[in-house]
Amino acid sequence: MKTPAPGRIHSIVLVLLSLAVLQTSKAQKVQNDIDIYSLTVDSKVSSRFAHTVITSRVVNKADAVREATFQMELPKKAFITNFSMVIDGVTYPGNIKEKAAAQEQYSAAVARGESAGLVRATGRKTEQFQVSVSVAPAAKVTFELVYEELLARHLGAYELLLKVRPQQLVKHLQMDIHIFEPQGISFLETESTFMTNKLAEALTTSQNKTKAHVRFKPTLSQQQKYPEKQDTVIDGSFIVRYDVDRPLSGGSIQIENGYFVHYFAPDSLSTIPKNVIFVIDKSGSMMGRKIKQTREALIKILDDLSPHDQFDLISFSSEATTWKPLLVPASTENVNEAKSYATGIQAQGGTNINDAMLMAVQLLEKANQEELLPEGSITLIILLTDGDPTVGETNPLNIQKNVRKAINGQHSLFCLGFGFDVSYAFLEKMALENGGLARRIYEDSDSALQLQDFYQEVANPLMTSVAFEYPSNAVESVTQDTFRVFFKGSELVVAGKLREQSPDVLLAQIRGQLHRENITYMMMSHVAEQEEMFRSPKYIFHSFIERLWAYLTIQQLLEQMVSALDAEKQALEARALSLSLSYSFVTPLTSMVITKPEGQEQSQVAEKPVEDESRGSRVYLGPMRFGHSVGDRTSRKPGGGLKLLNGTPLFGPPGPPAAASPFHRMTSRLVLPELMSPLAPASAPSPTSGPGGASHDTDFRIKGTTPTALPFAPVQAPSVILPLPGQSVDRLCVDLRRPQELVNLLSDPDQGVEVTGHFETAKARFSWIEVTFENPQVQIHASPEHVVMTRNRRNSAYKWKETLYSVMPGLKVTMDKEGLLLLSRPDRVTIGLLFWDGPGKGLRLLLQNTDRFSSHVSGTLGQFYQDVLWGPLDTADDSKRTLKVQGRDYSATRELKLDYQESPPGKEISCWSVEL
């Protein structure tokens, strides 16, 4: 292929599953030149082990050479196993080599003046892969990337994450996710940040006892963001969550092709009491949002302590101080006192990690010596810091040595690194050396939730000193088979290789300690039966257990290398490298070299990134190219996307500005003549469909109302607008006025729903509204900052006006670009939440299908769905009347209000209003 002159090359970043798109001033034309005519994602999950294939087919429609860049995101724990490009019928594969050999080939290319174009960077949950190639006029290119990962169980669920961002309409776009779980699938749910009601028509899910198939295949019209435009609405994450049945307490053993995997997660055990010390950094670098979020999270965590637990707090800056001289029981009184203490923590001073950690160990040792630790309980230390040590002992190696010597294998240490100014490698090694783990807390609006989620992972220990044993005449080798603690909602995984002449039955023994007793499980698995089970399903990729064994072994070897000494570390590295090369995994020890057509840049190298010692992100850029396009002039921040340096950042193709919603959100059945205001002349009903003509599952629109824009009216939106179907008045405006903070808005035990709110009387607004469902057990907490959905102790945060589409058994949760959050269930009342920006701004509650409330509904708002008696109009003033609810009289006044179901600034409506 002839290489065009540099001056004639235009760059297009072709995004499949990507972070961002850089555009030149002719970006729209260039994007149209490079056409993605097919994009498929095929993910096969076989007993937690996911094998994902991304295939993209593109054609250059221009009459000149164009450069296309394949760019995608994959999960952090995944290993790339293959990449190839097919150009003009010729396949150009990626070859996995030892990193040193790949670097030598890369350096030689650099010496020839060629560039290495692969960019790899860590994000919060994903890593980025990128490779570019020049495409001749009318030529077609097929990109294919394969990666594998073991889905870990967190808080009772496995999660498969896919990023979908094509940045243009794709004629053939299809995702297929096949799941096979021999234990049986207990629940399955999907969630998307880009799904609309129109796109949801292209999503299908089928499921039986052991198999599930999720397919997403949208048409071109379903993908369109705007009519007659090429912009796509598909831009974000697609997530599948599920869990499996566990009929046997000893777990599940699965065998295929001479390898086995043992999954262990008993769920019927009682929680072991814990003694936990929270060590909180309050140095000057924590000032501002960090310390505020830390206080917020700590208060929530303290509320979650079990009455059987004991705890204490240590805060440190230049010096460390304890809240109490000894651990105290987590009684209501002590927890409330600790919350008051946490509220007063202020940031200032240096960072003395060494003294704080030694003080924590001394507290536990003192409690142990005085026999204050309950029998059978476990001890945890949780450290939160955002920076490197600056006061006292500042040498990280000495601190690690001091902490290791003090703990002496008696306690588990968990280290949380807040932001990117902390040495993550320092914290990780210190945690791994002491039976715990490290976690980075990303500095963002949901940092407090990240802290709470981490605590939930370790909040409920079920077993300690867990050991797996297999007969030596049956098993040749196994992965890690001893574990210090098993926590509720997680899973222990052991994989191994069987001997060639192994018995027909594989036996396993699992020993562990409960709160007050030891326990032993016995398992037996027939090899031939297991082999047959994995031989038949057509969509299961075979030899997956062998690859799972290799994957898990490599991950554990890399983890052991963190705390190993030189000689041991070299041996671990040699074994991990050998397995990486044998099974074609791109790991931190290997690189993939991408070959390309003659005449093009010959060396592109993919590396597996690791958390950097100081900034949490390793970016492998190679030399920067110049003269090709502005797309090369980029900067990067840790975990972030790409940003233009020479002008306005452009992400994605331009489109028309977001238009105001063409429809009202609430539905009322009737507007009575007595409610009509002279300021509100009759007008045509609102349209009955959303953008693009798509009808919505739940239609919050006002039909037949007569709103008029308010040029001067000093009216505001009420606290709540209640639709009253079947009553003589079709809606009621409610204003909360009485001094009250926590308000029980409505509760219906038959519907299994409760809505509460925190009302700030001084500001006349809700600071939060919370909706709790009994089945499924889901809680939605809405604040002006964001929406938090909690299920199985797992928190997910969403910003207002970010598209959300989550479907779980018995509940659908959606949010559109205007910020309307809908919670809908079959044959139940639909609840909406909205943060309204108009006059009287704040959180608002919306209700539909209120005729479905039962006769047992109650609460400040729920009472109006009992027997309500409306009195006649006041003879002296027809804008007043009385209504009687459950024997209590309320005065109602006909007033002008702003309808918050409209986009701000809202429309004026006439409404009967009551003050509570």
UniProtKB/Swiss-Prot annotation:
Tell me the Pfam families matching this sequence. ITI_HC_C, VIT, VWA
Q: Where is the VIT domain?
A: 28-149
Q: What induces it?
A: Levels of ITIH4 in serum increase 3- to 12-fold on inoculation with various bacteria which induce mastitis. Peak levels are reached around 42-72 hours after infection.
| Localization (cell) | Secreted
**Start and end of every VWFA domain?**
275-458
For the keyword Cell cycle, the answer is no
Q: Which cysteines share a disulfide bond?
A: 733-911
- PROSITE patterns attached to this UniProt entry: VIT, VWFA
- Signal sequence bounds: 1-27
In the record, biological process GO terms are:
acute-phase response; hyaluronan metabolic process
Molecular function GO terms recorded: serine-type endopeptidase inhibitor activity
Name the protein family: Belongs to the ITIH family.
User: What does the record give as the function of this protein?
Assistant: Type II acute-phase protein (APP) involved in inflammatory responses to trauma. May also play a role in liver development or regeneration.
- Stated name of the protein: Inter-alpha-trypsin inhibitor heavy chain H4
Q: Which organism is it from?
A: Bos taurus (Bovine)
